[in-house]
Amino acid sequence: NGKYCTFPHAIEFLNRKYADIFPILTSYPELENYLSPFMDAWESSAVEQLQGQIASAKIPLSRMISPALYWVMTADDFTLDINNPEEPKVLVVGNNPDRQGIYGAALGLYNSRIVKLINKKKRLKSAVIIDELPTIYMRGLDNLIATARSNKVAVMLGFQDFSQLKRDYGDKESAVICNTVGNVFAGQVVAETAKTLSERFGKVLQKRQNMTINRNETSVSINTQMDSLIPASKISTLTQGMFVGAVADNFDERIEQKIFHAEIVVDNEQVKRETARYVKIPQIIDFTDKDGNDTMQQQIDANYYRIKNEVRQIVADEIERIKADPELSHLIKDK
């Protein structure tokens, strides 16, 4: 029933010995072909080759071994199909700047799963809003932007600069993300980002007037040439509150003025009034025992050790199953 099919269980299993992992996985016909190269290397005692291949996966995952993270990523408090008409949800997750590399991987896992679940027909209107996009990796984001509009999913991304996105997502994927979005709002940016935005906004035919004055006469010439609608120099010197951007329209909702350079006025008094009406997030789980003691850490630690013990027991049961099966017993190497 999926009770043990959690990410923490997978991490614990991956950190078992090769003598446990390979026979167990190979014993399942649907996994046998995937494990074949590893089994060949293991049976031929090519341990160094195996260690190099598997360490690249084990080391990043091992950094995620944490009682707190194990607590969050086990059990089934809710499903991730946030736009399910039967059970709609608002899901908010945040990264920790001090442990960005660790939690970013966990958030990326959740995000990738959410993308697959929400991008379907016959679902509620929904939105995926990501601030500081480069701090987490979201697999399939480019495809979500390209296809989600037809499934009533709005995608809103916030980041400081295109160079950040290139650094963390790579040149190709970041280029696809930037070129696929239909609406762009930008404040002050410099260098390559300002130049890219200026090119995106296009050029317009502008008149230029030149006046030449000498002792005998004054001459005026008027000519036209294509110039940037919003020059990069202007984008790089925008003041606070000033934005440039471009918006997309629909067949039945035409927008004549798609490019803008204007001030977005924020009603600070209204914001304060709204902030004053905020309510506290309700307490979902109470860790206080009957004597009034806070047992949060004890319960989190107990969950951590429970997962480790469950994986040990699963491995032991699977090894016994393989030994008892004449067709599989050859997978267990004699020590």
PLM regions and their residue ranges:
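P-loop NTPase motor core of the ASCE superfamily
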Residues: 143, 166-313
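P-loop NTPase motor domains
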Residues: 1-153, 168, 236-239, 247-254, ...
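Acidic, glycine-rich active-site loops and adjacent beta-strand->loop/helix elements
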Residues: 134, 162-163
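Structural recognition of the conserved hydrophobic beta-strand(s) that form the central parallel beta-sheet
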Residues: 154-160
